Amino acid sequence: MIENKIELNCALHTNKNLEFLCLDCKLIPCCTLCISRGGEHHRHGIDSLESIQTSSILSMMNNFKDVYPKVIERIENDQQILKDSDEIFNEIQSQYNKNKITINEEFKKIHNILSIIQLDIERQLTTDFQENTLINTTITSSINNNNNNNNNNNNNNNNNNNNNNNNNNNNNNNNNNNNNNNNNNNNNNNNNNNNNNNNNNNSITDILNISIKYIQQQYNNDDHFKIDSNSIELIKQYQQSLLLLNNNNNDNLNKLKEYNNQTIKFDNQLINDIKNNLKTIYSFENNNNNNNNNNNNNNNNNNYNDNDNNNNYNDNNNNYNSNKAEKLNIEIDENNYKFIKKRNKNYYIYSENNEFPKNKEGIAFGEDCGSLLEFNWNKNLKNVMLLDGFKESLEPGVLPNGIVHLEIGDIKTPLVVGSIPSTVISLTFNDGFNQSLEPGVLLNSILNLRIGDIKTPLVVGSIPSSVFSLALHDGFNQSLEPGIIPQNNKYKDFSSMQGVKYLTLHNIKSELNIGSIPKSVYQLTLRDGFSKTLKPGVIPRSVEIVTLQEITKPLIIGSIPYTVLTVQFLTGFNQLLTPGIIPEGVKVLEFYQVKDLLTPGSIPKSIYSLSFKDGFDQILSPGIITDGVCELYLRGIKQPLVLNSIPNSVTKLDIYNEFNQELTPGIIPNSIKELTLGSLNTQLVEGSIPKTIQKIILYGNIEPSSLDVCKLDKSVLIYKK
């Protein structure tokens, strides 16, 4: 019997009361909708709550007694899941903010590279235009100078012409005075007036005719001619005229040939290739915790073992031993297909004896792959790896067009002209490659080339001039005589994109001499135990960016040429930078996870932009950062800042990415006009930010309200990104 005053609403249908017990479902209470058509307990055995037997109630309560602890456990589990979810989401949110900052930083680097290239092109255009301007000025000055001399002579003759005529007439008058004085005086006056009116229009030829006539008259009267001032002027002009004619006009004609009218053209196909390559510069990786990863790996391994026979992936058919698997990083996907993960690309291992997934973008071919011709149908195939032992023919047309990335190991078949498709833009020769690379085997479509410890020497022409980025990896031991690494014949010419611009040298065994690094190289990276001495002149003056990481031989003065604009010291670089190592002329300087490298004078006064990032571990005592630095970037440094760490020359300051040093008043100088803050782990106080600041940009966990404690002027511009 149910008391009428007690509401017994159904949890599923809140507008209905519980009236029944389901006899088929552990006596779960139900309402009329629960047992109706479409309800969960339709056609189940039921018993009315109004007439329920005591035994049924006891049975239900005992069931509830067993169920309730599980409910409590479920609630606790749900609370734990909720807590874990919040923690994971907070990590995701934090990583999201870091990713946004990383994107901004990386694309800023790309923008800087493009800006530098643009400046180089504009500088080259300006230089060419200045040369053309000089040619024009030289020709104009030469011709105008000659014209001025002639004009001066003409003016002198015209100015003196009247006097000459007057003198001639006067002399005639004097000679005839004895015969008829009065008449001749009248005639002389008339002649003088006529000569004065007419001689202004006389040409040089007319003047000369008059002078010749006068001289002849004098010669007839007397053998001795008296040279007057007018004749002297004509004699001088005669000399200058001969000098003008003797001056070879070929100089100006040759100058005309020196004009250089250029039209800048861009390789749109190459630009499109670069744009497509830019899409491959990033990847998304799951940051799962270790336990989840271990569980997933164990599950994958169990699945693989259980289904080993069904998929024919047993050890007897596998040509890759454990060492090679470790070297190649062989993994197994959710369908038990093996693949090699390299440079964010998956290469699925193909064997003609085993099942293989269709339409994969990346395939690795080993010694049991059979003919590759059947893969011409796969239009999705973009990435190919030829593994050690590959022995199939590589005649032209075997590797299908459409391949973009190609990696070649210790294959047993030679490469010929046409073996590598013209669509390949990225090519890698892995350790052990032992085939000849004659000129023409590598086509001019290749932009990115990586070479490991290959066993055959390179010759001039082995590397095509189209290669834009070249990396020589650990163990490379082939000669690098001048010409092996191609260069553009025109110094620092980015317009044609010919010649290696980006060169990365790992722990190579080849010696570097002057000329080994071509003059086309724009950025040079030395890393991973690079152990060659950098004598002055080895790095050519074309290089504008030098990146150093884990090099073992000390730098000396002159190792880095004065023409370099940017120097980066990456994780693992551990050499003391004595004054002069970084030359005057460098504008941008970046330090990453390095420690105790700097002394006063290490940083030259030419530096405009300075960065300390990702675990930089040195106290920036006053004087380390030199006056002249205008932009300063601080990210995740491990030592506190002190007063006067930042000089007054700095006007732009960026502090971000886990910066956890105190910003006590005075640390940031009053010279700062623009301040960027992001992901700080430090508390701001009044005075942390000088009140002279003009602009603040906020990233990550920094909100505008967190600046209230600084009591900034309302005129300060604050941006949240």
Swiss-Prot record:
Q: Which InterPro entries does the entry mention? A: FNIP, FNIP_repeat
Region described as Disordered: 143-202, 285-322
Q: Which GO BP terms apply?
A: cheating during chimeric sorocarp development; regulation of cell differentiation
Q: Which SUPFAM superfamilies match?
A: B-box zinc-binding domain (SSF57845)
Coiled coil stretches, renumbered:
242-329
Composition skew (Low complexity), residue ranges: 286-321
Extract the CDD domains matched here. Answer: Bbox2
Keywords of this entry: Coiled coil, Repeat
Q: Where do the FNIP repeats lie?
A: 390-432, 433-475, 476-528, 530-571, 573-614, 616-657, 659-700
Top-level taxonomic group: Eukaryota
Q: Which PANTHER family match?
A: B BOX-TYPE DOMAIN-CONTAINING PROTEIN-RELATED, FNIP REPEAT-CONTAINING PROTEIN-RELATED-RELATED
- Protein's recorded name: FNIP repeat-containing protein DDB_G0290617
- Source organism per entry reads Dictyostelium discoideum
